[in-house]
């Protein structure tokens, strides 16, 4: 039968187990998010970080067999290490990305993931042994510590998704979680102080770590911002981290640029070239374009071009991230570019997944414009599949027209023609177009309809800055190094079952 002191100590151990588990899972998913943002390909990065973290836990658990005495002070020092290393992890990652040679950031991220995983793996066996040492039977100590650990894992994941990432960002989150680890260590240190030699020395060291973490919490994000500025050619004037992505706006004199997770979305100097080709051939191919659907395009620029047509009665814009739409409606630089298009009474904005929207809606559209980010992760890749384009076709009126941004036929030749082949596989007639956009390079589009498309007779009935009637046929001319005749490459449709486009995309862009 446990006495009151042993009961109190065992409760401390169980609570400590749950809290450090919360911290561990937050660090685990934080490293995945860091890898996804900085290195790209979210599925790959989350897979690697989770695997490395679990491997580290296994290594730590194996090493813990050597820890049989002085368990509390060993636990305290493990928490000190997790707090310091984990707390500064995001801050250092941004610094390495800005200043170190290519590849160093990946090596650092994977190393830090393994180290934090190993430290986390040591914690549980120590706590189980300590609970057993104070009188709790082994079966009870194991069950209760593991219960606290697993329950903490769920709580940590939920907290990261709904609290830490959207409200604190990656740098502050790491420092905050490090402070939580440190707090657990200091509480345990105090409550078990009678068992610990040189208590004051350990407490002072913990205090120093606390000062460093608090300094990082208040000043680290600003310094990391300066690191991140090195990744952009122009000064950053706006940066936020939404629930879905990091949104960055830069300015150099009159050049306003929007980046999502570090990928350029447009430059105000030449965006008209991109958006006019995206919008006007499709709109001009329909006699009376009354009902228009835009998938993506949360910056509002495509909507601005669509609203030039007097026949348009309804524009539905579907963009997953409400933060992008909010920025487009409130930032004075973006408002100047999109002319407040998203606030027009004809425009209805829906913040939801494009795939889900098409599954749910019963509407038919005269024109559908697909202005989505490139297929650089699994979530986006599904929006470049035969299944997705089949849904698009099913909501296209018989005489309607589809236009899809399809990456670069020069830099990502195989990607561009795979997207074209995928759209063709839905029994739509396609026309391939491309245009030079200085900030992007040569950029490609795929136009599709149930009817034959003839750009030779097409006329644009609205004002433009770049595109003319005479130019439209020229958009379909591809050079030998960018056409469909790709040596040693088999074109096949991208599907949900065989999502090979993402691998093609990674390979195409790895040198750019």
UniProtKB/Swiss-Prot annotation:
Spermidine synthase: region residues: 217-457
Membrane topology note: Multi-pass membrane protein
A GO cellular-component term linked to this record: plasma membrane
Location of the active site: 371 (proton acceptor)
Binding site for spermidine: 275, 299
UniProt-listed GO biological process terms: spermidine biosynthetic process
Transmembrane segments: 19-39, 48-68, 76-96, 108-128, 151-171, 172-192, 199-219
Protein name: Polyamine aminopropyltransferase
Gene: speE
């Amino acid at each position: 039968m446990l006495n009151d002191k042993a009961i109190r100590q065992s409760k401390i151990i169980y609570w400590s187990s749950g809290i450090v588990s919360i911290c561990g899972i937050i660090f685990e998913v934080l490293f995945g998010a860091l890898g996804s943002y900085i290195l790209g390909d979210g599925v790959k990065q989350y897979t690697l970080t989770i695997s490395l973290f679990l491997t580290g836990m296994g290594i730590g658990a194996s090493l813990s067999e050597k820890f049989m005495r002085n368990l509390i002070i060993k636990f305290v020092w493990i928490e000190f290490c997790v707090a310091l290393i984990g707390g500064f992890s995001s801050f250092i990652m941004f610094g390495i990305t800005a200043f170190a040679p290519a590849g160093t950031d990946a090596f650092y991220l994977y190393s830090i993931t393994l180290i934090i995983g190993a430290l986390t793996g040591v914690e549980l066996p120590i706590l189980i042994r300590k609970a057993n040492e104070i009188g709790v039977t082994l079966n009870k100590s194991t069950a209760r510590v593991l219960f606290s650990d697993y329950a903490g894992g769920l709580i940590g994941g939920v907290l990261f998704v709904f609290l830490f990432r959207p409200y604190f960002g990656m740098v502050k989150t790491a420092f905050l979680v490090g402070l939580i680890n440190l707090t657990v260590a200091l509480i345990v240190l105090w409550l078990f102080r009678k068992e610990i030699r040189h208590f004051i020395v350990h407490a002072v060291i913990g205090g120093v770590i606390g000062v460093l973490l608090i300094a990082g919490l208040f000043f680290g994000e600003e310094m990391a911002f300066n690191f991140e500025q090195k990744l952009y050619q122009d000064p950053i004037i706006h940066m936020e981290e939404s629930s879905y992505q990091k949104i960055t706006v830069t300015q150099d004199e009159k050049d306003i640029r929007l980046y999502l997770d570090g990928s350029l979305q447009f430059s105000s100097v030449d965006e008209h070239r991109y958006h006019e080709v995206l919008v006007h051939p499709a709109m001009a191919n329909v006699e009376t374009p009354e009902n228009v659907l835009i998938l993506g395009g949360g910056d509002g620029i495509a909507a601005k071009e669509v609203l030039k047509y007097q026949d348009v009665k309804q524009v539905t814009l579907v963009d997953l991230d409400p933060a992008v739409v909010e920025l487009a409606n409130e930032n004075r630089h973006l408002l100047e570019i999109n002319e407040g298009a998203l606030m027009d009474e004809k425009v209805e904005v829906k913040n939801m997944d494009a795939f889900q929207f098409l599954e749910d809606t019963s509407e038919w559209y005269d024109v559908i414009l697909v202005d989505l980010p490139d297929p650089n992760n699994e979530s986006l890749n599904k929006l470049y599949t035969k299944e997705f384009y089949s849904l698009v076709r099913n909501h296209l009126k018989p005489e309607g027209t589809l236009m899809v941004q399809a990456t670069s036929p020069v830099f990502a030749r195989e990607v561009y023609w795979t997207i074209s082949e995928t759209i063709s596989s839905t029994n739509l007639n396609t026309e391939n177009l491309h245009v030079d956009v200085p900030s992007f390079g040569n950029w490609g589009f795929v136009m599709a309809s149930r009817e034959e498309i003839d750009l030779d007779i097409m006329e644009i009935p609205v004002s433009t800055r770049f595109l003319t009637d005479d130019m439209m046929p020229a958009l379909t001319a591809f050079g030998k190094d960018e056409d469909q005749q790709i040596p040693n490459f088999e074109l096949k449709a991208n599907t949900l079952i065989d999502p090979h486009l993402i691998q093609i995309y990674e390979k195409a862009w790895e040198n750019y």
